From Swiss-Prot:
HAMAP family, per database record: IspG
Protein family according to the UniProt entry: Belongs to the IspG family.
Name of the protein in question: 4-hydroxy-3-methylbut-2-en-1-yl diphosphate synthase (flavodoxin)
Gene Ontology molecular function: any one: iron ion binding
Pathway(s) this gene product operates in, as recorded in its UniProt entry: Isoprenoid biosynthesis; isopentenyl diphosphate biosynthesis via DXP pathway; isopentenyl diphosphate from 1-deoxy-D-xylulose 5-phosphate: step 5/6
InterPro entries: Dihydropteroate_synth-like_sf (IPR011005), IspG_bac (IPR016425), IspG_bac-typ (IPR004588), NO2/SO3_Rdtase_4Fe4S_sf (IPR045854)
Binding locations of [4Fe-4S] cluster: 270, 273, 305, 312
């Protein structure tokens, strides 16, 4: 039952990616990217539907050639979530997906080609109200910047980004967001900090090629957590060598931990020790699996003993503290004693009842408003 986040977000210009606002006073958007073959329309649509069920706001799709562009058009007709087309090298692919209804173009103006080709892409985006993401990556810096700096640095990333920002602004195009990603946490954080002071456009955060599920989660939580805590960031993507659905889950968990955005259960659980009166780890695993479908933001504390249990339980919407017997707290007050028999079943029932109650209360406030 914690309050609003104390974080003051950086002021930025609001743009729209399809129906999703990005920047300004909009909630921080959670993005992911498909890892299926774009030409396999059925598989890609199925993956996007799973991402949408997990709560994704925006999905990026790689479009490497014209065949993939045509597949993108078919995919776009079959899903509801806004789609970003990831385009490199061939400007004609960007023009084609613009015709097919793309919600955002992710390009690097530096590898699209001559000025007239960049202008053609920008004109197509402007005519159709399509925003652009300038995506700068430490692994693909321009050769002159590599030569100037000797290696990727925060300053090199920012110089590349500003070069592309100026390019779009010369063409009088303002609906864009920017990212300056690196796999090194310190480099990425320093680059975003520098860039945030120099432009007003929304910033898309990410630690690129972060790693597998565990290592990538840790890297992303550290890097993005530092930036988000400073108010920097308008969209996030957790890059994991894992099921893309995990990217969405981790993204929401990072935002929940900073009280920037809530979706579903925020669990507070002890790591357990010999004082526990019930199996905390088993209980948590079962609850997380059973309650994945709940979208209502609730704090649920699961603490195995009476050392910290009552204090944590009193701060949660629903709290369980181990003892003889165990004790359930609801809205900070002792409500029910429980034995270990059917502990998870009863706790699930109470959480679902609380979620339904909160949903009804929120709906009532909206109606009265």
């Amino acid at each position: 039952m914690h309050g609003e986040s104390p974080i003051k977000r950086r002021e930025s210009r609001k743009i729209w990616v399809g129906s999703v606002p990005v920047g300004g006073d909009a909630p921080i958007a959670v993005q992911s990217m498909t890892n299926s073959d774009t030409n396999d329309v059925a598989a890609t649509v199925a993956q996007i539907n799973r991402l949408e069920a997990a709560g994704v706001d925006i999905v990026r799709i790689s479009v490497p050639d014209m065949d993939a562009a045509e597949a993108f058009g078919r995919i776009k007709q079959l899903v509801k979530v806004p789609l970003v087309a990831d385009i490199h090298f061939d400007y004609r692919i960007a023009l084609r997906v613009a015709e097919l209804g793309v919600d955002c173009l992710r390009i690097n103006p530096g590898n699209i080609g001559r000025e007239d080709r960049v202008r053609a892409v920008v004109d197509a985006a402007r005519d159709r109200g399509i925003p652009i993401r300038i995506g700068v990556n430490a692994g693909s810096l321009e050769k002159d910047l590599q030569k100037k700096y000797g290696e990727p640095t925060p300053e090199a990333l920012v110089e590349s980004a500003l070069r592309h920002v100026e390019h779009l602004e010369r063409l009088n195009f303002k609906d864009f967001k920017v990212s300056v990603k690196a796999s090194d946490v310190f480099m990425a954080v320093a680059a975003y900090r520098l860039l945030a002071k120099q432009i007003v456009q929304p910033l898309h955060l990410g630690i690129t090629e972060a790693g597998g599920l565990r290592s990538g989660t840790v890297k992303s939580a550290v890097g993005l957590g530092m930036l988000l805590a400073e108010g920097i960031g308008d969209t996030i993507r957790i890059s994991l060598a894992a099921d893309p659905v995990e990217e969405v889950k981790v993204g929401y968990d990072i935002l929940k931990s900073l009280r920037l955005r809530s979706r579903g259960i925020n669990f507070i659980a002890c790591p357990s020790c010999s004082r526990q009166n019930f199996d905390v780890v088993k209980t948590m695993n079962e609850l997380e699996g059973r309650l994945e479908d709940l979208l209502v933001p609730l704090d649920v504390a699961v603490i195995g003993c009476v050392v910290n249990g009552p204090g944590e339980a009193k701060e949660a919407h629903i709290g369980l503290t181990g003892g003889t017997p165990n004790l359930i707290y609801i809205d900070g007050k002792p409500a029910q004693k429980l034995t270990n028999d059917n502990l998870v079943d009863e706790l699930e029932r109470l959480i679902r009842e609380k979620a339904a109650e909160k949903t009804a209360a929120d709906a009532s406030v909206i109606v009265r408003g």
